[in-house]
């Protein structure tokens, strides 16, 4: 089997014991299986939930807290306990671990996003195993983020993973709730995530986690759009992750055809960037951008809305108001208002400008 880069997401329900705390047995089982992947030469990134589950009992809570401050306090205590447990287990296999705590804002800010990309790349090049969790103790978004499901999809795209494995307490996707319907049909393979598939999943998570099956399906859809195949399921034993790569996993495989990898810069524009303004274009410009992959030139711009600076992301709309995409603008709003509708040869070069493109095709994403 060729060497692959794999992102494994382990949810709270796959780590917890009967009392809601972290099960040493389950954690050891996961680590042994991850070590097997490394032994076979694969590169591994672990996305782990469980900080709240690891910490709530230490603070005297009888069960997982329901208030935001309770969850964040439990996460602050539990994250160090969780990381300590992982580090000690991986040390038995001679594997060096690294901790990264991320928030949504780390993805929306280009510099921090690029730093995360560079750090993960260096860790993998050095054969370390990055362990990533949402920074639960300060991030409100995490507590409704889907139990790290979407985070795992975004990270899998960021590191250009070959596969994302989302491990949970259910062995795949079904057309009905298998716990309530004996005739529930399991999906062993789905070529894509359709609206019909999305509608089958409920929003509710387990008592120990915040993510239901819908968040996993949404994560799978995002990962597929970034060129990453997905597995959603469960398993036990040292071979469980290796078996997933061999096509023998106990769950559902989603998308296995080679996908076109989305470059890091375009991932950031498409999924994380904040839109600072809007540019309206004529029909000719819209066709050139969407159908022919051209850059946007000033001649095609018909209107500029809101104030934005050079390098900020703007959305582009047709004269009918339909959003066709977004990209990084090489002009400020003030500059663009002065040159909109003009041919490139008629525009006086300002300052150090070396290009007349409003949005270069390398910094554009169609929606």
From Swiss-Prot:
It comes from the Bacteria. Its main location: cytoplasm. SUPFAM superfamilies: Carbamate kinase-like, PUA domain-like. ATP binds at residues 9, 168-169, 210-216. Pfam families: AA_kinase, PUA. Pathway: Amino-acid biosynthesis; L-proline biosynthesis; L-glutamate 5-semialdehyde from L-glutamate: step 1/2. Belongs to the glutamate 5-kinase family. This is Glutamate 5-kinase. The lineage of its organism: Bacteria, Bacillati, Bacillota, Bacilli, Bacillales. The gene is proB.
